[in-house]
């Protein structure tokens, strides 16, 4: 994530031998230097993030593909959010990892622009697909009869992806392959000085962080109010029913009136509340991971004396990518049956392969009495594989 849309500070030395992005001239004769110890820490952190993001989100997609409930609306949004997290891992974390290993960008100008473009596409997609999933949960709780249809879900996701592709387009113009020192080229940003970096980073912060957080907070505020209202009315209805037996018909009519008021919120089932809890934890992880990143990005462009080469400053920029690692584990926590089905299917199919490769099994199955037993046992194994558990 570091340097995705701002200057690619990386672990360059504090002596400032490399020319800053967006400036002409002012180059030095010697090659740029960097803090090698900090660079090794960056590489180690990015390797860990890449492994966790790839493995976790791949498991989520595989589990969603094999589950019997693959047409669930929540699972539909989870699938696209996992795809967005894979885009972050492949097109953002991996290029940054290679970049930190080589120190400089080794590739043509077209590749430089493409890498910077795709880095921000993943960032936008991960944010706005999470926002879309939260809006869906808000509608499911607050307006259950007006919730989105399957066709509308697909259209909303398609528009979100297209919007992310369009919103990332400025990266192609801002970044290019430039000479940052005598004979040294790198993929750098070109801004109109002095207000260009401030305007662009502020816009990105508003679009990717501040506005989504405000919308997410509003959604979960409405959800919390609706759940509180649901609990309060149900408690009142239970009290009225209890009083009906003691006070006669008048109390019975009062209880019915309260039950009529609560009928529309009875649709808030435990399953829906559980999905709300899951998306809330995902949103909380989003805020925790992205806040340090945007804080240091804004600090770097609005304060000329910002410690851009300090270790905490650099590491804070890497934390945003942790969001793509956290989401799969949150899914596992709240939808454990998905992964139980995946593991059961894997173990069952492995057992079938091992059983089919045993020598002498064919000759045994030809016996008149035992053949029925073997075939029935094998077919039941097939049924267990094709029909995963619903736990």
Curated annotation (Swiss-Prot):
Q: Which residues are glycosylated?
A: 8, 15, 26
Q: Pull the Cytoplasmic topological domain ranges from the record.
A: 64-74, 136-154, 226-277, 335-391
Q: Which family does it belong to?
A: Belongs to the G-protein coupled receptor 1 family. Vasopressin/oxytocin receptor subfamily.
Membrane topology label:
Multi-pass membrane protein
Modified residue annotations for Phosphoserine: 368, 370
Q: Where are the transmembrane segments?
A: 39-63, 75-97, 114-135, 155-175, 203-225, 278-296, 312-334
Q: What is this protein called?
A: Oxytocin receptor
Check the record and name the InterPro entries matching this protein.
GPCR_Rhodpsn (IPR000276), GPCR_Rhodpsn_7TM (IPR017452), Oxytocn_rcpt (IPR002062), Vasoprsn_rcpt (IPR001817)
Q: Does the keyword Disulfide bond apply?
A: yes
One cellular-component annotation, GO: plasma membrane
- What broad taxonomic lineage does this protein's source fall under? Eukaryota, Metazoa, Chordata, Craniata, Vertebrata
> Does the entry annotate any disulfide bonds, and if so which pairs?
112-187
Question: Topology: which residues are Extracellular?
Answer: 1-38, 98-113, 176-202, 297-311
Q: Where in the cell is it found?
A: Cell membrane
What function is annotated for this protein? Receptor for oxytocin. The activity of this receptor is mediated by G proteins which activate a phosphatidylinositol-calcium second messenger system.
């Amino acid at each position: 994530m570091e340097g995705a849309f701002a200057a690619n500070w990386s672990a360059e030395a504090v002596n400032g031998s490399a020319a800053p992005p967006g400036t002409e001239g002012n180059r030095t004769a010697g090659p740029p230097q960097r803090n090698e110890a900090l660079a090794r820490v960056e590489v180690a952190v990015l390797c860990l993030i890449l492994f966790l993001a790839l493995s976790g989100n791949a498991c989520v997609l595989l589990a969603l593909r094999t589950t019997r409930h693959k047409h669930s609306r929540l699972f539909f949004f989870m699938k696209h959010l996992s795809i967005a997290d894979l885009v972050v891992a492949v097109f953002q974390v991996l290029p940054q990892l290679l970049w930190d290993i080589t120190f400089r960008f080794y590739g043509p100008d077209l590749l430089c622009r493409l890498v910077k473009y795709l880095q921000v596409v993943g960032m936008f997609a991960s944010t706005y697909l999470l926002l879309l999933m939260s809006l869906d949960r808000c509608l499911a709780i607050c307006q259950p009869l007006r919730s989105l249809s399957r066709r509308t879900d697909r259209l909303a996701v398609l528009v979100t992806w297209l919007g992310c592709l369009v919103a990332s387009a400025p990266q192609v113009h801002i970044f290019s392959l430039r000479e940052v020192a005598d004979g040294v080229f790198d993929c750098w940003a070109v801004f109109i000085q002095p207000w260009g970096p401030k305007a662009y980073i502020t816009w990105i912060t508003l679009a990717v962080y501040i506005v989504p957080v405000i919308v997410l907070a509003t959604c979960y505020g409405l959800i919390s109010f609706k759940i509180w209202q649901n609990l309060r009315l149900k408690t009142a209805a239970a009290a009225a029913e209890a009083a009906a037996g003691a006070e006669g018909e008048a109390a019975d009519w009062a209880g019915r009136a309260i039950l009529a008021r609560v009928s529309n919120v009875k649709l808030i089932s435990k399953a829906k509340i559980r999905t709300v809890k899951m998306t809330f934890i995902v949103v909380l992880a989003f805020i925790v991971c992205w806040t340090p990143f945007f804080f240091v990005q804004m600090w770097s462009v609005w304060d000329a004396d910002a410690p851009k080469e300090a270790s905490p400053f650099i590491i804070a920029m890497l934390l945003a990518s942790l969001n793509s690692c956290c989401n799969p584990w949150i899914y596992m926590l709240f939808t454990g049956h998905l992964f139980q089905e995946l593991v059961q299917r894997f173990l069952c199919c492995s057992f079938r392969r091992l059983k089919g490769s045993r020598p002498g099994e064919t000759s045994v199955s030809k016996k008149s009495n035992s053949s029925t037993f073997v075939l029935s046992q094998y077919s039941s194994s097939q049924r267990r594989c094709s029909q995963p558990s619903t736990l």
